[in-house]
């Protein structure tokens, strides 16, 4: 069994965790609380249990830029978008990580980035015009079930219903690419530089 934690041990654990993982202040605080629960707290020379200030320790690491919620949110949002996840999924992931509301809003994708992520997911999962030709042809029930399943998959991934509906109704991949391109043009960013994850 590992010994109880003193203030130096907590500081070392916090530094090790921040060095090893991209994290938020809230996650680091939860990690330290969990470690205290697992191992307990050490006693001082008088036999009293120490009372560490975890919030102050986390605040100090934030002050030293070892923990940066903004950088975490930016990186995580970009990563999820590049994997084809939608805005709702990104927001939920950041909220779960303890990122504050203003930062979540600041890193929410724009319309063009949302469309781009939806198109990427459809391409990866072979949905809509990216799917296998002839699947369910002639059987309206099979077509309807496949469409409902595809819509559900896109909604679970955090995409807007309108985006899922448009992509699944598209006849050709070029139609989807044009739709994504129009959103980038409307944002004044034809190359997709500003409105990215």
Question: Model-derived features: where do they sit?
Answer:
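An alpha-helical, amphipathic repeat domain used for nucleic-acid recognition
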Residues: 1-197
């Amino acid at each position: 069994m590992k010994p109880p934690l003193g203030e130096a041990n907590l500081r070392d654990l916090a530094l090790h965790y921040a060095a090893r993982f991209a994290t938020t202040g809230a996650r680091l605080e939860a990690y330290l609380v969990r470690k205290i629960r697992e191992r307990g707290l050490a006693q001082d020379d008088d036999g009293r249990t120490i009372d560490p200030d975890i919030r102050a320790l986390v605040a100090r690491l934030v002050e030293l830029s070892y923990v940066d919620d903004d950088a975490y949110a930016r990186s995580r949002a970009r990563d999820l978008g590049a994997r084809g996840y939608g805005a709702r999924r990104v927001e939920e992931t950041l909220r779960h990580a303890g990122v504050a509301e203003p930062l979540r809003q600041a890193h929410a994708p724009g319309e063009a980035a949302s469309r781009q992520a939806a198109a990427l997911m459809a391409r990866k999962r072979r949905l809509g015009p990216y799917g296998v030709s002839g699947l369910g042809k002639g059987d309206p029930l099979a077509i309807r079930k496949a469409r409902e399943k595809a819509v559900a998959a896109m909604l679970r991934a955090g995409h807007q219903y309108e985006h899922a509906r448009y992509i699944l109704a598209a006849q050709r991949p070029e139609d989807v690419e044009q739709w994504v391109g129009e959103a980038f043009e409307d944002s004044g960013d034809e190359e997709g530089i500003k409105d990215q994850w």
